[in-house]
Amino acid sequence: MLAFATAALATCGGSDSPMSAGTRLALGTWGGNNVAVIATDSITHVHVGCTFGDFPGNVTLDANGRFAINGAYMLHAFPVAVGPSMPAQLSGQVIGATLTFAIAVNDTVAKQVVSLGPGTVELGKVPNMGACPVCAIPGMTHALLIKPSRRK
């Protein structure tokens, strides 16, 4: 799955963004058109259209702002969640306040890898999800628009 996600991001272009290795993804809501990322200390929650996934912890970035993390993804989430969560890999790169990412989902039912993205989101921007709402992170009871937090 990593090979797909890395190849998808390579086509996006962009230059490397020097930063300290071990920097973490800024906490808060990252929004775009039909894509959203909500980063907390305990989980990174991602939406692409009417699908969503959860990736454990807060994403650690390398010196160029790149990352890859494994988690679980629901391919049929709205209007009614159908099917199991499936193994997935979220990979991407942060340059400034912009995150470009791709997701490779191992569809264990259809026995194929499903690619989502690339998607681009900006820190602090409200996601424009159209007909598909941004759902709550498991256990989250407060507003979904989390103030951005820059930390190194």
Question: For each of these PLM feature ranges, what is it?
Answer:
Residues 85-131:
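Surface-exposed, polar helix/loop patches in the mature regions of secreted/periplasmic/lumenal proteins
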Residues 15, 53, 70, 135-138:
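General secretory precursor processing signal
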Residues 10, 48, 130-134:
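Extracellular secreted precursors and ectodomains with disulfide-bonded cysteine-rich loops/domains
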Residues 69-91:
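An anionic, turn-rich surface loop/hairpin at beta-sheet edges
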Residues 33-75:
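N-terminal glycine/threonine-rich, aromatic-flanked beta-hairpin/loop signature
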Residues 20-37, 103, 127-151:
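Tryptophan-anchored aromatic micro-motifs
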Residues 6-25:
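Bacterial Sec-dependent N-terminal signal peptides
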